[in-house]
Amino acid sequence: MVSKWGAGSAFGLQGNGSNSSGLRPLLKRTAQINLRQTQDNAQTGKFSKYLNTAQALHQMGVIVPSLETWPGKPSTGIATRAVGGVSVQAATRLDFYKWRSAECNNKVIPHLHVPTRLLKWPDRCDGFKRGTEFVVLGCRGGPGIGSRNLMSPHRAQLGHRQAEAVCRKPVGF
């Protein structure tokens, strides 16, 4: 039987009438290309891990600049996005920081000297015990630190191995 694409065509399931040899060279070539790319790029695993984490953050509402196109300011060319009245600068690198609340009666704001940004899960101290750990998603050149930059680990739904994929230093929960 000959397919409508012709005898021996890669699109035909039967190839030359009785065998599917038309597909074999194509599949072999594709497998070789994939193998070569994996061997040449030692960072493939790290990039895949980062991409999965970035996509997860994007779906949770934490906008990752590489996955979202933001309009730039004409004067500076720095990409920004206004969220809740706060202008947030886009960054090429996202950092995770861990902060442990000392007193639950105080405002839950970490005293870090690094700008942070988080676009969802603004947690208040209500319902959190002393010693509750929060994960702060930060980026260089972002806005000042505030309670809106916090999220608790259980709400972030990120394990420390995922967090390490895009952070500057290891983060444990």
UniProtKB/Swiss-Prot annotation:
Belongs to the MgpC family. This is Putative MgpC-like protein MPN_092. It comes from Mycoplasma pneumoniae (strain ATCC 29342 / M129 / Subtype 1) (Mycoplasmoides pneumoniae).
